[in-house]
Amino acid sequence: MASSTGEKGLIVSFGEMLIDFVPTVSGVSLSESPGFLKAPGGAPANVAIAVSRLGGRAAFVGKLGDDDFGHMLAGILRKNGVDDQGINFDEGARTALAFVTLRSDGEREFMFYRNPSADMLLRPDELNLELIRSAKVFHYGSISLITEPCRSAHMKAMEVAKEAGALLSYDPNLREPLWPSPEEARTQIMSIWDKADIIKVSDVELEFLTENKTMDDKTAMSLWHPNLKLLLVTLGEKGCTYFTKKFHGSVETFHVDAVDTTGAGDSFVGALLQQIVDDQSVLEDEARLRKVLRFANACGAITTTKKGAIPALPTDIEALSFLKDQKKRQTNLKFSKWCCTASPC
């Protein structure tokens, strides 16, 4: 774990990093798109960069192809202040690619090229265990559970981090087309469920994992386990709901003109982890937790206003400026309503 010398706690993110190819226009199929924009992505890498841009300490552990794309991605991590000592390069496999279809509302569909890609080939003996042991928070998804040897590397890294005292953060980041079957996806995603201290799922993932279309607290709480400290369900434009052992509630999001929702959930998670890494007592204080989640919602909302994941992740200055503007708008709206009530409008 991080030392108590005043240095910020380290958040280590484990998993995949890839290239997203995002269409230049929304609302068309991949074959109909006139062109694509190249954008770095991969949920765990997105979270690491989100943390760093917000002023936190972040490291990434994973494997990239020993190709132009792989070295480009490693350079992007370094450029954004993310520790890259956990990266390995594979000479025999390519960096993963994903083509993303954008609907008119900014939601996405994916087509992946990873058969196998370098991230799937990370071995347990390639892990930087010293880096993992230094984590105060260890974050991961489920894509690294799909195949060996990466699954074994994932399990080893998670075990080492837990033994070292790290808080474990899990965002399944369901990508159903990558799994052999929906049943296999559920089984493997849930196989490590009770290890995590913090779990974030989307409303789509909640329905998938519970096989229940009813989006209510009872459905969400069916995913609770005794060792869990915080369960979060993100609801897109409806904000998020939160559950702890002592309290639960919801926090509204901010309404923006969404262009691309890629990376919004990762931005949310990165903001949350960056805010709690050095003071985990926030998880037991509802008022403070709500403030943190409002900040995380703001970061997620900002991310949807630009195309691509990593290019859209906000800095701490951008996030605070956004919140300040939102507060000013709310104040002006309240004043306008008061004027109309106090005098003829």
Curated annotation (Swiss-Prot):
A Gene Ontology BP annotation from the UniProt entry: starch biosynthetic process
Molecular function via GO: ATP binding; fructokinase activity
Main function: May play an important role in maintaining the flux of carbon towards starch formation.
Similarity annotation: Belongs to the carbohydrate kinase PfkB family.
GO cellular component: cytosol; extracellular region
Keywords annotated in UniProt: ATP-binding, Carbohydrate metabolism, Kinase, Nucleotide-binding, Transferase
InterPro entries referenced in this protein's UniProt entry, alphabetically: Carboh/pur_kinase_PfkB_CS, PfkB_Carbo_kinase, PfkB_dom, Ribo/fructo_kinase, Ribokinase-like
EC assignment: 2.7.1.4
Species annotation: Arabidopsis thaliana
Reactions mediated catalytically: D-fructose + ATP = D-fructose 6-phosphate + ADP + H(+)
Matching Pfam families: PfkB (PF00294)
Top enzyme category: transferase
Name of the protein in question: Probable fructokinase-3
Keyword Chloroplast recorded: no
Pathway membership: Glycan biosynthesis; starch biosynthesis
